[in-house]
Amino acid sequence: MFDFSSVDLLDAFTRELRLCKVTEGEHVVVLSEPASRGDYVAAAFGAAKALGAHVIAATVPGGSPAPLPSTHTGAGPGLRSVLADTTAQDLLKSADLVVDLTQEGFIHAPVQQEILRAGTRILFVCDAPDVLVRNLPDEGDKQRVLRGVELLKSSRTMRVTSAVGTDLTVQLAGSRPEFQTGFADDPGRWDHWPSTMVLCWPELSDGRIVLAEGDILLPFKEYVQSPVTLHIAGGRIEKAEGGAEARLLETFFADADDEWGRHLSHMGWGLMRSADWFATAMYGKGDLMGMDARAFAGNFLWSTGPHPVLGRESYAHLDIAMRGCTVSVDGTEVVTGGELVER
């Protein structure tokens, strides 16, 4: 019996690599581990070849130094087999584009920054097939997120409020605004398919965050069942109050025994209008990274743990996606009551 599973993905991967500006004669490395999806490897390989690139499929041993299960959490440092192998690193540095199909990627690994400094573009892909296809980005998405980045760069404070009691003030000085747009088209750029979001890395934030029923805790991939109030001072979660999810978070911080586990890291808002908030409920936890929740248009996304701008390395990484918030940047609302505002 023939395996045709990659055929349906070939068109999507080809369109995606075009957005990544893969051209004839470029060198593309498709990076995988034994647990990676074979149909993704085949589709990425075929797409790169169809666009005239030189393509190599490189499979390295699995295994991560992260204490958490390294399966689509967004918290891992990458694979030991790459972190400890300069030959593998040199291969990635020599490529024009790396299509990273590993389970966890190298999002929080210093070696990724070395690869990017070599001019390599990196595209990380790991969500389920229909999630990728439904959220295939558009070239115009880049201008949308860049407008948000420019607003953050020119502003001093971001305020987040909600009807259930969130009231957080964020100092934007030195917060290094960034974006994800779902494709890696510039030399030295990392991006994630799918994703469309604006984010920054502030140091100081004060107030309270109130999680409402239906907000999403990642990487647990669980919906909040009862309200949780988080008291924030100087960018640190001082206390979590509420029901089962509050106890879950307090236990997570205690068990992590991590210096930076309670500290906030990146935060921002989603612009991916094709995202499905209910995807988290419809798939197995091992099938999703959870980008529908992270990049959902009009969400407020914030996180804990690793903070590269401040030099904080941490495995205690949470992403929490909230709906129903109003996000204003120096008085300009970019999200109103959970609805994305685009001018």
Q: Language-model segments: which ranges?
A:
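Active-site bordering "gate/hinge" segments
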Residues: 1-225, 233, 258, 325-343
